[in-house]
Amino acid sequence: MGSAFSQRMYDSSGLQIGRVDSERYYDSSGRQIGRVDGFTIYDASGRQIGRIDGNHVHNSSGSQVGRIDGERLYSASGTQMGRIDGDRIYDGSGRQIGRAEGLRPMQIIIYFYFFM
């Protein structure tokens, strides 16, 4: 059963770049590009491409690719890659790069690390 609404991702110019519906990730044309099942991340063909471990995200080799600390997104090396402020998404230099509508921080980090 799907959710009552889709959660949407927009770029900095306001164009919709994707959406998430019931933990399935879609691109701007509506094509499914991946999904999350429990703590495992899959691409559109069903191949495991990552996993979630608490606030950490790992690639298919098990290497940490990022983590969330509050509203801040960090790379595996600890560099701040971005932050979320309300519905706005900023890169590491503070420039707004997009907007999320109804997405949790973990959904945003999954979208950016695996599907962009």
Task: Write out the residue ranges for each language-model feature.
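Long terminal segments
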Residues: 1-23, 27-32, 38-39, 45-48, ...
